[in-house]
Design a protein with these regions (language model features):
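Flexible, gly/proline-biased loop segments at the beginnings
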Residues: 1-120
Length: 122
């Protein structure tokens, strides 16, 4: 599943195959776990002061409850793992009553980003 890349030897390597290498697995794991354990908060500017936006729904999503089956640490570890191995991370925004209720991870291999002539997402 997913993309594979040709190496200078002519062999193809995918992210799954790369993760079988101890060095790759260890590097990705250290990065993912290090970022995953950090607190993630949403801030807003109040004049020149930054204040934590604890009343915002998005704050709860990114800091305490991204979805019904993942802790914030698991979610951010997956984000970093996808960024390391695929270069992108995508999440489906589940909306309820006009607000984002959950962020569901999507396999980057199943998404084709579309960009306009200015390289901005469409």
């Amino acid at each position: 599943i997913g993309l594979s890349y040709d190496t200078y030897t002519g062999k193809q390597i995918s992210s799954q195959r790369a993760m079988r290498l101890t060095a790759v697995f260890s590097c990705v794991r250290v990065l993912a776990e290090s970022v995953g354990m950090l607190p993630c908060n949403l801030y807003h500017l109040n004049g020149s002061l930054k204040q934590r936006a604890t009343g915002e729904r998005l704050h709860k999503l990114i800091s305490t409850h991204p979805n019904g089956y993942m802790t914030p640490q698991e979610f951010w570890e997956l984000v970093v793992t996808c960024l390391c191995l695929r270069g992108n991370f995508y999440a489906y925004k589940v909306k309820a009553f006009g607000e984002v209720a959950e962020l569901l991870p999507v396999d980057p291999g199943c998404v084709v980003p579309k960009l306009n002539s200015s390289w901005e997402p469409v």
